[in-house]
Amino acid sequence: MDALCASMKGTAQLVAICNQESAFWGEKISGRRLINKGFGVRSCKSFTTQQRGRNVTPAVLTRDINKEMLPFEESMFEEQPTADPKAVASVILGGGVGTRLFPLTSRRAKPAVPIGGCYRLIDVPMSNCINSGIRKIFILTQFNSFSLNRHLATYNFGNGVGFGDGFVEVLAGTQTPGDGRKMWFQAADAVREFIWVFENQKNKNVEHIIILSGDHLYRMNYMDFVQKHIDTNADITVSCVPMDDGRASDFGLMKIDETGAIIQFAEKPKGPALKAMQVDTSILGLSEQEASNFPYIASMGVYVFKTDVLLNLLKSAYPSCNDFGSEIIPSAVKDHNVQAYLFNDYWEDIGTVKSFFDANLALTKQPPKFDFNDPKTPFYTSARFLPPTKVDKSRIVDAIISHGCFLRECNIQHSIVGVRSRLDYGVEFKDTMMMGADYYQTECEIASLLAEGKVPIGVGPNTKIQNCIIDKNAKIGKDVVILNKEGVEEADRSAEGFYIRSGITVIMKNATIKDGTVI
C-alpha cells in the first residue's frame, strides 16, 4: 500500500473530508466556530518540505498517493466569535396609539391585546427572548400601558427559567425636566429617551441590543440572528421575510447585494416607488415559483445593533430621527454595514383588525401554520389559577377552548374561546374569537341579573355569532344574532357596543348587547 509521511504539529487531528478521505488539519477544530478566509489553493501531486512555511500542515493524507491533493494552510481558518446571550440585551417596544387595531386598543396597548385564548401579544417576544437564553429584557411602554403593566407584574418565571444576573425591567414612558412637554411615541425616539439605561454600569457588558416589536406572532431563536450579525461584522442587522405584492406596501422594503448587505431601504412605499423595490428573491434561496409569488424583501421590524453604534446613531448621528424603519435604517444604509437576515418561517404582523382576526383563527386549523404548543420552546404568560373547562353536551370542531370556561349545549366551529368564558345552551359560534373575561360572576349574581332583566358576562341562550371578535367582559344577551348579513365593511356603533372593521364585527370591551339584538 502506498503511504505518505509528513511532519505535523502536535495539535493535528484526523478529520473526515467531503469525499470520505482522511485529512489532518493543523489545529483542533472541535467545539470552535471556524471561518474560511478563502482557500486560494492550487492542485498538486507532489508537495515538498521546501514549500512549507511556518504553521502549515504540509499535506493531505489519502489512500492513493497518485490522487491530486490540496495543501491546507492553518492560517486559512480563524476562530469566529460565538454569540454570548449574556452580552445581548433586548428592548421590546410597547407601541404607540395603535389606531389600526382600534377598538381593540381603545383601552390597552397593542402588546396587551389577547391572542390565542390565553396569551397576550407581549408574550411572544418575551418567550422568544427566554427561549433564546437572553436574560436582559427591557420593555418600553408608551401608550395605554395600564393593562400591559398589570400583565407583566403577574408574570411567573418559574418552570426552570433562571435569570441569574438577568432581569426584566419595564421602562414606563415618562417626561423629565427640560422636556418642555414634548410628546414622543415613535420607536427610535422612545429608545433615545432611555439611552442612559444602556450607559449604566450594570449594562457595561452589553455588546448588542435587539429591538423587538410587541405586536408580531412568530417563533424565533434570536441568538441565531445575533450570530449572523457577528459573522458579518455588521453594525446593524435587519431581520426580513419574503413578501407578496398584496401586502408589500405595508412594510419597509429593501434591496440587498450578493453579500447580504442592504443597499437600499424604503419604508412602506406606494405606487411606482413600490414597484421599484421589486427584486429577484431567489437570491434568498427561494424557488423560481416562490420568488415569483414573493418579489419583495420586507423588514420584520426586528433589528440588532452594536451597542455603541445604536447609541451614536440616536445621540449624535441622527438626533432628530424618531423612527427606525422610516428614518434611522434608510440613513444608516449609506455609511454603515447594514446586513439582512432571512427569516423564512411563519411570521405575522398583527397590525390590523383583519390580520389579528385571521392569525387567531388560523391557530384552529389542522395542522396550524403556527402553534403555541411546543415543549422545546414553550410560550410563557401571566400565572392563572383556574379550574379545567366544563363542557356539557356541546359540539366542538376545530376550536381552541381556554381555561376555566363553562360550555352548555353549544356548537362551536373554527373559533377560539378565551379564559373564563360562559356560553349558555343553544349558542352557536362560527369563525369567532371570544377573548373571555377578567373575573367570574357567581351563579347567584347571574340569577339576580337575569331576574332584573340585565345581561350577565358571557353569551346568553340561543345566540348565533359568526365572523366576530368579542372583547373582554362582554355581556351578550339571549336570542342575539351577529352575522352581518348585509356585508357591511365599516361601521362605528360605539353607543350600541360594537364596531365593524373590514367586515368583522368587533364587540367592545365591557359592552352590553341586549336580548334579541340583530347585527
UniProtKB/Swiss-Prot annotation:
GO terms of biological process kind: glycogen biosynthetic process; starch biosynthetic process
Gene Ontology CC annotation, any one: amyloplast
Keywords, sorted A to Z: Allosteric enzyme, Amyloplast, ATP-binding, Chloroplast, Nucleotide-binding, Nucleotidyltransferase, Plastid, Starch biosynthesis, Transferase, Transit peptide
PROSITE patterns (alphabetical): ADP_GLC_PYROPHOSPH_1, ADP_GLC_PYROPHOSPH_3
Tissue: Leaves and tubers.
Pfam families in the record: LbH_GLGC, NTP_transferase
Protein family (similarity comment): Belongs to the bacterial/plant glucose-1-phosphate adenylyltransferase family.
Name this polypeptide is given: Glucose-1-phosphate adenylyltransferase large subunit 2, chloroplastic/amyloplastic
Species annotation: Solanum tuberosum (Potato)
